[in-house]
Amino acid sequence: MTETHALGSNWAGTYMYQAQKLHRPTKIEQVQEIVANTTSVHVLGSRHSFNSIADSVELISLEDLPAAVVVDHEAQTVSLSAGVKYGDLIKTLNHEGVALHNLASLPHISVAGAIATATHGSGVTSGNLATAVAKLEMVQSSGEIFAISRGEPDFDGMVVGLGALGVVTRITLDVQPAYQVEQRVFRGLRWKALSDHFDEITSCGYSVSIFTRWGEMDNQVWIKSRTDETDWAEGDLFGAVAATVDLNPIIERDAIACTPQLGRPGLWSDRLPHFRMDSIPSSGQEIQSEYLIARRYALEAMEAVRALADEIQPILQMSEIRRVAADRLWMSMNYEQDSVAIHFTWKREPEAVQKMVVQIENALTPFKARPHWGKVFHTDVATIAALYTRHADFVRLVGRLDPRGAFRNLWLRTYVLGS
């Protein structure tokens, strides 16, 4: 089925898609035919990006392809259609008694979209969601299908593909035996304590998030600990006090949408995200941006942002600071560097946010900040090229796999590939 009416906006209502057609294939052969006969095309995922990365003249939704989720216990993998969302994948994984190594803050996003943009959760030893990929199947611009597995040449360049290499139709991910997680929240962490004990705090659980508005006493620390590992003991956390009720990262909001806290153990999938699958995580009245910085620059980078606090706070809903382990994926924000992610959830005030993002990027320039591909940023293509040592290799890979430029939308030309 093909839709030709207005395609609407992203999840937050901050970007209106410009595509003229939306194709909804129900089988792979239709995907091949659409791609081979279209001049300019891209895949539309769960609409959780905050920029035009997933826009083009024509779009393809893979939601109507059979999910075909298959767990291979011997290989410790799960394979699935690229149209599957994490929330739906989780149901099968839990039924089969297996788990992923990590999840993003909300499970409502598509697996393929998260992988293509190197979306991440948190954890000193946990790579982003793309690091779980063991195999990809993809439709090239010629309409042909090819598959590539971990260890083969150029695999590391194809996983975080930004939609530039082809239409990923099937994904195989690493899994492990299911595990339980308990979550505790601490309030009132002071900046000096965070600065003095940053590594201790960010490694005191399997997954740790620090929520802040860049003031002195409004900081929350969310610690998600595997029950089969030893993490932070009872008591305070370098002066921060354990919460006695469930909290929302935005303290004024009800915690009903959030995953259970107070140390109550539960399945990995019910604790690693901040928001429950059966909830609406936000009103959508927001804009997001995020920058990933090598751990060695983290404290200086946070101080540079704090220096802008008076200008940031009027338009900020909340910031989140997380850790992500290094990987070998060419266009991952964590390529060859253990990273600290500084995330901003802004009020939906586009003009003010755009100006603030420029100021933040200027402040973070000395620290070689890499912007999150799916969020709002202004970093130009020349700067991007300098930030990624395999950038030239990626550009060559795009030219080889998509010689006619079918997947090179305006966003890719502007920020990644150049004109």
Regions found by a protein language model. Name each.
Residues 1-419:
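Noncatalytic alpha-helical scaffold of FAD-dependent oxidoreductases
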